[in-house]
Amino acid sequence: MTMYATLEEAIDAAREEFLADNPGIDAEDANVQQFNAQKYVLQDGDIMWQVEFFADEGEEGECLPMLSGEAAQSVFDGDYDEIEIRQEWQEENTLHEWDEGEFQLEPPLDTEEGRAAADEWDER
């Protein structure tokens, strides 16, 4: 799992990875049908992004499906509004780091560490 500090960096990296995984296709001929994204909040409050592109709609990856068809192709082609993508993101799907390298939608409340993390998240 590789995370990036900006959504733009994550999209660029995912585009490069898609092309590397499909060696016979160049960027102009790529046919992308699905755009997946995942937002992370680290313990220090930094926000990180992970993005994936897929040639077939419905493919599963590490991230959540966000756009499909022409919308996914537009993002792949660089024709997108980062603010719009951020606004479309559903905050309840954001993963929070509660222990180093361990991410969850919510901290576990059955441990003192989890309760402390929940209190910190509530303060933000």
From Swiss-Prot:
This is Acidic protein MsyB. The gene is msyB. Could participate in the normal pathway of protein export. Residues 96-124 are annotated as: Disordered. Residues 112-124 have a biased composition (Basic and acidic residues). InterPro entries: MsyB. It comes from Escherichia coli (strain K12). GO terms for cellular component: cytosol. It comes from the Bacteria.
